[in-house]
From Swiss-Prot:
Catalysis: reaction(s): (R)-lactate + NAD(+) = pyruvate + NADH + H(+)
Entry annotated with the keyword NAD: yes
Enzymatic class: oxidoreductase
Enzyme nomenclature, EC number: 1.1.1.28
Lineage of source species: Bacteria, Bacillati, Bacillota, Bacilli, Lactobacillales
Gene3D superfamilies per UniProt: NAD(P)-binding Rossmann-like Domain (3.40.50.720)
Active site annotation, chain numbering: R235, E264, H296 (proton donor)
Name this polypeptide is given: D-lactate dehydrogenase
UniProt binding sites for NAD(+): R155, I156, D175, M206, P207, N212, M233, A234, R235, D259
Keyword set includes Oxidoreductase: yes
Superkingdom of the organism of origin: Bacteria
Pfam families hit by this protein: 2-Hacid_dh, 2-Hacid_dh_C
Species: Streptococcus agalactiae serotype V (strain ATCC BAA-611 / 2603 V/R)
UniProt cross-references to PROSITE patterns, sorted A to Z: D_2_HYDROXYACID_DH_1, D_2_HYDROXYACID_DH_3
Length: 330
């Protein structure tokens, strides 16, 4: 069996090769993405493992079909970069890795939240200037006295809720589907609006859909409890960035922890030191004094990277050997 792996980082290559040696599978790995220019590299292979970031060109699906490719295994939980229906029409199964390490993202969410609540960034900036005074701008709050709203109560949302509850927070949640595992951890409310009106901190853990794109806009921020904090460790498209910046500037929100930006594709995960960034909204976001921005790194732990690499490769084998996989999304 021969598999083609795209968008491979050095650390992933080592894990992938270890997996290949154990499973007696031949791998060809490429640092670059799957594009119209690179799709011919798939010729002669049985399957594809990918870490697509930008939307996959629709013209690629029929080309893969001609090559006999029946699946693409995405190394992430999100699959919004694929045209799932078009892939299905061409007999191509798209799979994901739905649960690679919910705890990694949950722990990171709470870490950044605590940094915002206790003004750690401002304290560190003062210390670098040898300002050791105690002043009102660095005075924080007790996390355990806060109400936290979890929007999206799947694996990651629930893992996040558990940690906040461990600090003593009242945790409320909203999801179209109620998670039976959430009993005793959070209280469900009837709408997103109800959740944000009550919460001191709102944490997003929902997948992107046509219905929730830019759900968190200025109108929504005006319904937030004054001085609340927004955490987005889910998908950038959930938040209208211009409106978030305006809400922060107006004092509607106290701060924001942002790990995903809607138009991050040209920059993440790349070293852009010394380069001009043309996206002015992105520049405003990453430099805003009330924002802690991180480059889609909430998931990034040893456990998560290993599970993503092996989960995608296992899905490749499963489809090739059985015709389907338990992680199929289309």
């Amino acid at each position: 069996m021969k598999l083609k792996v795209f968008n491979v980082r050095e650390e992933e290559a080592t894990l992938a090769q270890d997996w290949a040696n154990r499973n007696h599978v031949e791998l060809s790995m490429s640092e670059g993405p799957l594009t119209l220019e690179t799709v011919n590299e798939v010729e002669g292979f049985d399957g594809i493992a990918n870490a697509q970031i930008e939307p996959l060109d629709d013209a690629i699906y029929p080309l893969l079909k001609e090559m006999g490719i029946k699946q693409i295994a995405q190394r992430s939980a999100g699959v919004d970069m694929y045209n799932l229906e078009l892939a299905k029409q061409h007999g191509i199964i798209i799979s994901n890795v739905p649960s690679y390490s919910p705890e990694s993202i949950a722990e990171f969410t709470v870490t950044i939240a605590l940094n915002l609540i206790r003004k750690v960034e401002l304290i560190r900036a003062n210390v670098r200037e040898q300002n050791f005074s105690w002043t009102l701008p660095i005075r924080g709050r007790v996390l355990g006295n806060m109400t936290v709203a979890i929007i999206g109560t799947g694996r990651i949302g629930l893992a996040t809720a558990k940690i906040f509850k461990g600090f003593g927070c009242r945790v409320i949640g909203y999801d179209i589907y109620h998670n039976p595992m959430a009993d005793g951890i959070l209280e469900y409310v009837n709408s997103v609006e109800e959740a944000v009106e009550e919460a001191d901190l709102v944490s997003l853990h929902m997948p992107p859909t046509a219905e929730n794109t830019h759900l968190f806009n200025l109108d929504m921020f005006k319904q937030f409890k004054k001085g609340a904090i927004l955490m987005n460790m889910a998908r950038g498209a959930l938040v209208e960035t211009k409106d978030l910046l305006e809400a922060l500037d107006q004092g509607l929100l106290e701060g924001a922890g942002i790990d995903t930006y809607e138009f991050e594709g040209p920059y993440i995960p790349k070293n852009c030191q010394g380069q001009d960034i043309s996206d002015k909204d992105f520049l405003r976001l990453i430099n805003h004094p009330k924002v802690i921005y991180t480059p889609h790194a909430a998931y990034y732990t040893d456990e998560a990277v290993k599970n993503l690499v092996e989960g995608a490769l296992n899905a490749c084998v499963e489809v090739i050997e059985t015709g389907t996989t338990t992680t199929k999304v289309n």
